[in-house]
Amino acid sequence: PNLGFYRNFHKILRISDVNYVYRKKNIADYEGVGAKNIKVLLPYYIERNNFKEDCKDTIPIAFLGHFENDGRDKYIKALIDAKVPVTVYNGSDWEKAPLYEGIKSCIKPGKREKEYNHTINECKIAIVFLSKLNSDTYTRRCFEIPATQTLMLSEYTDDLNRMFPADECAVYFKSPEEMVEKCKYLLSH
């Protein structure tokens, strides 16, 4: 969108009865342009698109998502270096990764719609990375993965841990080393 779009968007925020934002951080952004009555509207999943399928766990560990230059390639490289089987779906963005040469063997084309849900169902473990550019503390994928009853392995945030308590509903990591350790443990049990 161009500058005119944002100028009009900001005007509308000031006269709207209610403004919904994606994350708590955005409340201050909206207040900064004069918006009132701001509420967080969490992302969710769509039941007809995200559901448990009767299929085998044929993919040990996967990340289904875009590349962002926030260090996620270091996590994937750490898994590869530790000989932990990992697949990344959504290939083209990942060519921009600083560590692309070391991780390209595990990168596959993206999955959409029915294939996306089916692929998550085939995973024993589905990884969640959070956008640092957007200051995410959760993402829509955090709701889609549990809908399939696939184990969710995610970067830790307080928000996620409140929604999905650690080691009950999800498993969390704070470093590449911890991620590798948890993946090895989970795959062996």
Where would I find each of the regions flagged by the language model?
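Short beta-strand/loop segments at the ligand-binding rim of alpha/beta enzyme cores
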Residues: 1
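Nucleotide-sugar donor-binding catalytic core of glycosyltransferases
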Residues: 4-172
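C-terminal "capping" alpha-helix adjacent to the active site of nucleotide-linked donor transferases
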Residues: 175-189
